[in-house]
C-alpha cells in the first residue's frame, strides 16, 4: 500500500511539474527604433524561447516606420526564429503622434548600414498590427495569452474598435477579454508627476486602452526601469557570436558609448516570462488614469484589476543580474555563427 501511495505521489508530482513547465504564450508589442531597451527586451524573448520558458506567438510594431519591422525581422532571422509573424501600424488613428528625433532612429541606421539576412521579402505585405493580433488570438485557448506592451497603445486601441472578421466573429474588446490572461505593460510614472514617453506619444490611445482594457493590467513604470541599469560592459562583451550584431550597434547608433541604459522594457519581459517573485512586489489594485498632460495617476480601488510593480534594492540587483545572464548567453540556433 505504501509503495502504491509513493508511486501515485511521484506520478502526480511529475504531472504538476509538466504543467508548471508549460511555456507562457506571449505577444510582444514594441516601438522598436525609439530606445535601445526594446532591443534588449527582444533578445531576452529569444533566450526564453531557447530555454522553453515562453512561446512567442508574434511581434507587433506600434509604429509605421519600415525600419522598425526590418530591424525586428533581421533579429528574428539572426536568432534562428525567422517564422515569428510581425505586424506594423499601417496608418495612425491619432493626429497627436509626433516622432521627429532623428537620434532615435537606430533601427533605420543599423539595418541600412549592414547587410543582415531577412526572412520577409515583401514589406508592403506585412499585416496591420491589430489584424495580426486578431489572427493570433483567434487560434489560442481562452485566457492563455500574455500581451507584453513596451511601446504605444496604438495597435490596441485599433483592436478595441475592430469588428468581426475572417479571423473571429467577436469584436476586438470581446476577443481580448476571451483570449488574454493579462497585459504586462511598460508605461506611466506612478512616482513622479511627469509624463512618460509611451503615454504621450499616442495620448489618445493610452487614455482609452488603460480605461477600456477588459483584462488585468500590470504596469512596470518609468521609475522602476530608471532604477535598474543595463551595464555597458555587457554590450561590449556579450554578442560576439554574430558579426555586426544589431544590439551593440544599436547602442552605438543611439548615443555615444559607453553608457548604461535603464531597463524599462526588459522588466516587462522578465515579469511576463518568469513572474515577479524574487524580482518585485505588486501594489494594491486600483485605477490608472491619464490627464490632459499625459501624466498617469493611480487610485487605489479593490474592485479594479490594475496594479503596478514595486522594487527594493535587492530586487533591483536581481533584475539586473538576470537580464545580464540572459543576454550574455548565445542563442541556440543563430543564423550566423562566428
What kind of feature is each model-predicted range?
Residues 21-338:
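N-terminal acidic, glycine/proline-rich low-complexity segments
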Residues 1-23:
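Bacterial Sec-dependent N-terminal signal peptides
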